[in-house]
């Protein structure tokens, strides 16, 4: 399918979109079709009944994904220490630890709204999964993987405790769009590719706030995107999940726009020490009192814990209420 696309925000050079083979298709059958119809009805109900000025994501399995006990909080609740226990939150949650979550944590009907796509741009072909409304989305969430990852990681329904399945459902059921792309690197080329990808979908959903979630080394792209003036104007929030700090953010367009920032970090992260990320979080508040920043420390959690344990709905609804 060929389409010349307007790119009013960024010179992304997008010229076309083509569809690839969709991974992990759900089983067919009458029951699956009926469940899908109910899913579509639920999406339309949310889309047409929720007032835009009060838009927030409707619940999805909140009782399973809400944070466990809060051990400590300060900064008016913007800094929290969450009780994380490996035996409970991995072994007690997964059917096969770290490989397959128990079935009650997921709903694979959302796969009916999932496509494996690519766009051709001046930055190259960008492969990505898109879940939900590719036009007129109410909200867009983009997940950028870390070192060694790929676009498949962000749509795997069963790893990381089913948390990727939850964000897919939260977007799809609320008239939103979820994107999980491939990209070449964590430097300038990768940033150009993600800018082109987001420009493509932003042109089709001009009212949608765009949330960028960056896992581990993917944070390098979060910080690069924050430095882009035109891009920063569309960012609804940045999520740093087991990632690192960048002092240049304090002088970025996104910072001056007071774009909400969420940090999720394990206290036993051996890749990026939690103390340095906490210090950066506090530096934001010191430079700009009242800045919309949150930090969730998962006590005893490790490098990958925030991807498993971050409460997507709680975080994104907070950002929706605080975005510029």
Mark where each language-model region is.
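Short, surface-exposed "cap/lid" segments of acyl-processing enzymes
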Residues: 122-166, 170
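Alpha/beta-hydrolase active-site loop
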Residues: 184-205
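Short beta-strand/loop motif that positions the catalytic acidic residue
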Residues: 262-265, 269
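N-terminal signal peptide c-region/cleavage motif recognized by signal peptidases
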Residues: 49-51
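N-terminal cap/lid segment of alpha/beta-hydrolase-fold proteins
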Residues: 81-134
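C-terminal catalytic histidine-bearing segment of alpha/beta-hydrolase fold enzymes
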Residues: 290-324
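Short alpha-helix in the alpha/beta-hydrolase fold that links the catalytic acid
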Residues: 273-283
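Primarily recognizes the serine-hydrolase "nucleophile elbow" in alpha/beta-hydrolase
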Residues: 209-257
